[in-house]
Amino acid sequence: MIFIDNRQNKFDVTEELTTKLEEVISFVLKEEKVKEDCEVSLVFVDNEEIRGINNETRGIDKATDVLSFPMIDYPEDKVYKDVYLEHEFDKCYFDGDELILGDIVLSLERTKEQSIEFNHSFEREACYLVTHSVLHLLGYDHMEEEEKARMRGREEELLGKLNITRES
């Protein structure tokens, strides 16, 4: 299940946008071979709120585009499909029958700024950032160059399969 919580008032959150982002989340989970029913929360905020969360959780006092809060730990250089395809999770990882993957916090204000900066649509930027964040929930990272190349390649591959291009 995908929970969407709009905690900002600078942008209208349309049903079209939420439906598209739900489709992106579901598609990425399927492509990454997540078989369990899952729970992902997607929270929309503005730059001020994401700056506060970023400072509180990471000690970085500036706004960012998206933050990911995975509930599952991953061994170094491993992602969900490398480790957990046949894994039996403890019941503490579930809400009812759904595996809790984690939370995504997305600044719609920063999303809009970046869509202008990168000269593509707001929807394309939101889809990219949500794809990026779901991959973080599944263990992908970009701290090292090799990890970054793997993650960026996977992002582009997934967005391509969804026909979400930089021209979108």
Curated annotation (Swiss-Prot):
Alphabetical list of Pfam families matching this protein: YbeY (PF02130)
Keyword line: Cytoplasm, Endonuclease, Hydrolase, Metal-binding, Nuclease, Ribosome biogenesis, rRNA processing, Zinc
Binding site for Zn(2+): 132, 136, 142
MF terms (GO), sorted A to Z: metalloendopeptidase activity; RNA endonuclease activity; zinc ion binding
Keyword hit for Cytoplasm: yes
Co-factor note (free text): Binds 1 zinc ion.
Record-level GO BP terms: rRNA processing
InterPro entries with a match to the protein in the record: MetalPrtase_cat_dom_sf_prd, YbeY, YbeY_CS
Main location: cytoplasm
E.C. number(s) listed in UniProt: 3.1.-.-
Compartments reported by the entry: Cytoplasm
HAMAP family associated with the record: Endoribonucl_YbeY (MF_00009)
Protein family (similarity comment): Belongs to the endoribonuclease YbeY family.
Free-text function comment from the UniProt entry: Single strand-specific metallo-endoribonuclease involved in late-stage 70S ribosome quality control and in maturation of the 3' terminus of the 16S rRNA.
Protein name: Endoribonuclease YbeY
The organism of origin for this protein: Clostridium perfringens (strain 13 / Type A)
